[in-house]
């Protein structure tokens, strides 16, 4: 995920680490740990968080819709979420602000295995699985309207994290929310030939896939700026040492040492 990874700092200059007890910070990921989180993992690898005086707890979510709401409730300091989703949170009055960028290009797709589905127009009367309420329904609606369908022509069901397994089991005809560098690649490695529709090719404006949000009251806290400074160091090191960082990641997390993650890391 190196080519599409950035760690934009929206809060100004970094604050260097100071002596004393490490300051605790909780980051809730958007999904289970995967190569899209590589800059975070590398910042941890190289000790960048510790150098900034931080003790960072990285938490995969129990529900992919939950992370920003935990930040809004002040149960976590930061969360990874999706740029379009931020507009939904604003409409709901959630006190969230974007503080940084993790992935600055779209990754979202609609994926099918049925070769008769050659465009989103062929989803009429089909069942589509999704994982994150709100944004994925809106994204799919834009895509099918671009193809002159109505959103109600498609049945949607929430499959949570089980995008590929729901597709492989025939529970759904297609899924939205699978990434072109993760779920599409996973299916190929399983010998399948997925039909992949990139969302930006069907009326969805380009956007930043993964962003970092904080509670509105906390955006000026020094630990937020320290985290972003460390993350930038992780991103820079990742770009300079892709193979070394993969090997370190695979060693530290052997359960994630798979061909899928190895290819996606690049």
Residue ranges and their predicted role:
Residues 5-17:
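Bacterial N-terminal signal peptides
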Residues 102-111, 192-217, 228, 263-266:
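Periplasmic-binding protein-like
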Residues 126-130, 171-172, 219, 232-238:
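Second-shell loop/turn segments in exported
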Residues 187:
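Extracellular glycan-interaction surfaces
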Residues 220-266:
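Secondary-structure end/capping motifs
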